């Protein structure tokens, strides 16, 4: 008894448990009363995941630990020394993450198989296989993760040795999505291509004489979806989202092809008119004609309809052109003359009356 008291580690089967990964020995109580164990800590004979759990202190270094065989063959260890909940959870991680899971067939010769006796497990210890001295089931990995425990990292090359169910389900999905993404990138234009197309589209649209509203109406006539002038303007200014720019680009490209093919073809004039209202060209007035109009404006800034008609006939201009010119000239006069000052045509008319009176005298 003196020797046993001086060396409390001599009787291992009934007095202590030794951690195989560290040099510190933790002494336990000689016996633990089975009635004091919680039912959640030790569920004997009820399988949770189909794999009995081995104690991680023994399975980690079964060959290097000289006491592993004595622990496996002792009936007291199997009956009285029970692992705690933390030991069971950590053992479940090591068991599920071990690369030996797929290399051993689930038969009776496996040390973790159901129905394997402790004597058979101890005999496998001498051959170098890890043993499990506890045949009770453990908590699953998912149950462990719910409690916030940490999962040890997998060693390199372990993914292929794992069971297909334990592998990451996103391996094949990532490959498929990557393949689809590469396929979609070939059809999706880049931002530089969109910018270049928007610039070319605006130049060709102006050259053809169509407004942004005309393009929107033409798209509605061709494809049944009318776009507003604001949408076409934002496309040319690159203010739409990248997704909407990609959707609108092929429609505008087809419209350009239709407009280019219709230009110069007399039979397709009605088709162009159906696409939208074509912009009227800006009227250019010669300098001599503009001088005559200025003279008439100083005499009468608001001519009557008969005066506009006779003036248009004398200048060989359209009546609408002459009328619009007088309207624009009056607006220009208002902008140029400060408020309160007499306008130019009033000064001109007053000087004309003065000259007439002087001539009469």
From Swiss-Prot:
Record keywords: Activator, Developmental protein, DNA-binding, Homeobox, Nucleus, Transcription, Transcription regulation
MF GO annotations: DNA-binding transcription factor activity, RNA polymerase II-specific; RNA polymerase II cis-regulatory region sequence-specific DNA binding
One Pfam family named in its UniProt record: Pou
Biased composition (Polar residues): 119-131
Start and end residues of each POU-specific domain: 186-260
DNA-binding region: 278-337
Family annotation (CDD domains): homeodomain
Recorded superkingdom: Eukaryota
GO cellular component, one term: nucleus
Regions annotated as coiled coil: none
InterPro entries the UniProt entry points to: HD, Homeobox_CS, Homeodomain-like_sf, Lambda_DNA-bd_dom_sf, POU, POU_dom, POU_domain_TF, TF_POU_3
Compartments where located: Nucleus
Tissues and organs where the protein is expressed, per its UniProt entry: From embryonic stage 10, expressed in the Spemann's organizer. During gastrulation, expressed in both the involuting mesoderm and the overlying neuroectoderm. During the neural plate and neural fold stages, expressed in the entire neuroectoderm with expression in discrete regions of the developing nervous system persisting at later stages. Transiently expressed in the pronephros from stages 24-32. In adults, expressed in the kidney and brain.
Stated induction or repression of this protein's expression: By nog, zic1 and zic3.
Keyword set includes Calcium: no
Region of interest (Disordered), residue spans: 100-131, 150-189, 333-361
Biased composition (Basic and acidic residues): 165-183
GO biological process: brain development; regulation of transcription by RNA polymerase II
Protein family membership: Belongs to the POU transcription factor family. Class-3 subfamily.
Function comment: Transcriptional activator. Induces neural-specific gene expression to act as a key regulator of neural differentiation.
Protein's name in the database: POU domain, class 3, transcription factor 4-A
Organism: Xenopus laevis
């Amino acid at each position: 008894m003196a020797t046993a008291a001086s060396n409390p580690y001599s009787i291992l089967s009934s007095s202590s448990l030794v951690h195989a990964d560290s040099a510190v020995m933790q002494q336990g109580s000689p016996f633990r009363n089975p009635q004091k164990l919680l039912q959640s800590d030790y569920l004997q004979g009820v399988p949770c995941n189909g794999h009995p759990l081995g104690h991680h202190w023994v399975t980690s270094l079964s060959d290097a630990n000289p006491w592993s065989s004595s622990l496996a063959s002792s009936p007291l260890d199997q009956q009285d020394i029970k692992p705690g909940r933390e030991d069971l959870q950590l053992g479940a991680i090591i068991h599920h993450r071990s690369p030996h899971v797929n290399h051993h067939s689930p038969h009776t010769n496996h040390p973790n198989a159901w129905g394997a006796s402790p004597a058979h497990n101890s005999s496998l210890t001498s051959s170098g296989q890890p043993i499990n001295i506890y045949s009770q089931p453990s908590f699953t990995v998912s149950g462990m993760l719910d409690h916030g425990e940490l999962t040890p990292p997998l060693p390199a090359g372990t993914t292929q040795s794992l069971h297909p169910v334990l592998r990451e389900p996103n391996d094949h999905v990532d490959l498929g999505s990557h393949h689809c993404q590469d396929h979609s990138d070939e059809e999706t234009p880049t931002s530089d291509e969109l910018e270049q197309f928007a610039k070319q589209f605006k130049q060709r649209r102006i050259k053809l004489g169509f407004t942004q509203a005309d393009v929107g109406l033409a798209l509605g006539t061709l494809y049944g979806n009318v776009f507003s002038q604001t949408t076409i303007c934002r496309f040319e200014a690159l203010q739409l989202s990248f997704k909407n720019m990609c959707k609108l680009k092929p429609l505008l490209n087809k419209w350009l092809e239709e407009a280019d093919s219709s230009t110069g073809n007399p039979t397709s004039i009605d088709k162009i008119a159906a696409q939208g209202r074509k912009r009227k060209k800006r009227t250019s007035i010669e300098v001599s004609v503009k001088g005559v109009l200025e003279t008439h404006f100083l005499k009468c800034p608001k001519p009557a309809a008969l005066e506009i008609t006779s003036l248009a006939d004398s200048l060989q201009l359209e009546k609408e052109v002459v009328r619009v010119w007088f309207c624009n000239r009056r607006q220009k006069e208002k902008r140029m003359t400060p408020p309160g000052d007499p306008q130019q045509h009033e000064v001109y008319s007053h000087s004309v009356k003065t000259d007439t009176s002087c001539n009469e005298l």
